[in-house]
Amino acid sequence: MGRLFGTDGVRGIANTELTCELAMKIGRAAAMVLTDGNRRHPRFVLGKDTRLSSDMLEGALVAGLCSVGAEVVLLGVISTPAVAYLVGKYKADAGIMISASHNPYEFNGIKIFSGDGYKLPDALEDQIEAMVLSDVQSPTLASGSAVGKVISAETAVKDYVEHLKSTVPYSLEGMKVAVDCSNGSASATAEKLFTELGAECHILNDQPDGVNVNEDCGSTHMESLMEYVKKHGLDVGVAFDGDADRCLAVDNEGKLVDGDYIMAICALDMKERGKLARNAVVGTIMTNMGFQKFCEEHNMRFAATKVGDRYVLEEMLLEEYNFGGEQSGHIIFRDFATTGDGQLTAIQLLCLLRRRQAKLSSLSTLMERYPQIMINVKVSAEGKLAFYTDHTIKAEIEKAKTELGTEGRIIVRVSGTEPLIRIMAEGKDLEQINRVGTKVADIIRERLMKK
């Protein structure tokens, strides 16, 4: 798999790249590195999404953790941000989530959180990875009464939902909301959350069967939700991904409201209420240029990081900001959470609409979005490596940047979670960015597809 840890934990095709043997080793190494041998029975909370392979990997992780004396608290099917929250709630040393987020069901992944609920920094991931690859953990295997045990957390869903409810001061009674659970982790919590907050819920795609997670539904396939909201005359629609750390929305007219729009709406509201720390918002290099102009117009500072909510969070912690996110819907309300949380984002947005007595369609006009295209080019692991040294590709990218000038931009990057080269072109002239982006994609295919 190359380097084990990408931008969002370990990820790969289950039982091919991400095997039970590897998962067991990761469990052992995580327990040893994160507790540094200071506790006889360190406690780990362990959650999973709805993929067919999640049960298998759960068993392997449990075996690895218990074999070095860790106590494992099983949370069952639950969201990634729930794991991050419950680490602290249950006074655990660390948390682990089994999920491949927005990827198809055949993929799976392992995300690790420290005791304070934050994703691990690169340095700790490197330590775990080194231990896994060198296999040095076997001499420290526990025996006798030192072997770890497993506990089931029967109230995990309730505890997490109560936490989310505590973040909103208003009832959502009377609001008509469609909720697309993506046949993923939100299937375990969304209906309970929105119903208890008083909303009239239309719960969609909440029947996971192990293989239908993210399948033509959720935040990566918004078309059916857009149609549903418009057809049924609802106030808003919200959609999550497989592990519910993302949220995208649909307004009352059936139009898509992506992460940049959600951030613009929420950031301005927070600023006007004196709740936006240092009047600043953190985004990424992929954040739409229209959002950056929006921040300038409203005297808000904008900070851009590398792609990945972990990097957004790092900047927030470094500069003591409390709000940031990504166009993809990873949005971090740091006053309430340590990571992106789709369901938290949804109820914060709905609460804002209730407080302002506004329709989402009217608030979406606050920001003018620049035309933007995204092209994904599938490549092998070797192709991803070759991308960095291919001078022909680099020359074509530089040519594209020159053509777009100051009125647009192009970003070409290797995906940290999938076997893809991602191309984003943006500017005022849609025809131009389509032409420029397509040319770069064609060159990448020509140069890397055979690698």
Enumerate the predicted regions with their spans.
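Phosphate-binding and adjacent anionic-ligand microenvironments
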Residues: 236, 273-451
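Gly/Ser/Thr-enriched, mixed-charge loops and adjacent short helices
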Residues: 13, 108-230
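An N-terminal, well-structured beta->alpha segment
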Residues: 1-63, 67-68, 146, 150-177, ...
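Proline/glycine-rich low-complexity loops and linkers
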Residues: 126-161, 166, 252-325, 332
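N-terminal small/polar loop signature for handling phosphorylated ligands or for N-terminal nucleophile
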Residues: 32, 40-108, 192-250
